């Protein structure tokens, strides 16, 4: 909202519907309707974290990036599933706060879409921070108990490895609210 105000953009929050090409009805949380006329409209629907098939976020042991920001304490051991920007940022924060962090990534490199050389250098920096990487490794399942989880994985050679941890951060992408 700050950036909207700073850039002189009018911000409305609510349920919107187009009355015509340039008229929009906005119903706020108090059911008050506001009708606005506009030349240009930006619709920002937001997004939600994507999980792995059959695995649900509980935001305590199996967390999304939102849950990772709200943890009550620094976990002893965290496994980050996914080597993209969001998971690496969260993993880096928790590592610097004292957690042992392992990143499990299905692909060969972290930060898909980034220049390979930059990605390689970025990974070196994160390793110096103490983050452990398990590349070309597939998550096959997660078993959760009351206070921990075990992640079952297999690497590109078929070797099976289990990771025990206090928190699993699943950071494999986001899906738009459409």
List PLM regions with ranges:
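Structural signature of beta-strand start/N-cap positions in the alpha/beta core
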Residues: 34, 39-40, 77-79, 100, ...
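Helical element adjacent to the flavin cofactor pocket in flavoenzyme catalytic cores
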Residues: 1-11, 39, 45-49, 122-133
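Alpha-helical transmembrane segments of multi-pass membrane transport proteins
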Residues: 10-13, 34, 71-72, 86, ...
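Glycine-/small-residue-rich beta->alpha transition segments that form the dinucleotide
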Residues: 38-40, 44-50, 66-68, 165-178
């Amino acid at each position: 909202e700050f950036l909207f105000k700073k850039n002189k953009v009018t911000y409305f929050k609510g349920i919107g519907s187009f009355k015509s090409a340039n008229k929009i009805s906005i119903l706020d949380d108090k059911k008050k309707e506001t009708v606005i006329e506009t030349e240009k409209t930006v619709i920002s629907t937001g997004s939600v974290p994507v999980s792995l098939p059959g695995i649900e976020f509980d935001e305590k042991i199996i967390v999304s990036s939102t849950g990772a920001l709200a943890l009550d304490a620094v976990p002893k051991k965290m496994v980050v599933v996914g080597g993209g920007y969001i998971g690496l940022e969260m993993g880096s924060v928790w590592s610097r706060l004292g957690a042992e962090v392992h990143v499990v990534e299905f692909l060969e490199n972290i930060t898909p879409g980034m220049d390979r050389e930059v990605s390689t250098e970025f990974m070196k920096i994160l390793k110096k921070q103490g983050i452990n990487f398990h590349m070309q490794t597939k998550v096959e399942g997660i078993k959760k108990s009351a206070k921990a989880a075990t992640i079952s994985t297999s690497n590109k050679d078929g070797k099976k490895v289990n990771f025990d941890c206090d928190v699993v951060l699943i950071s494999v992408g986001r899906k738009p609210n459409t």
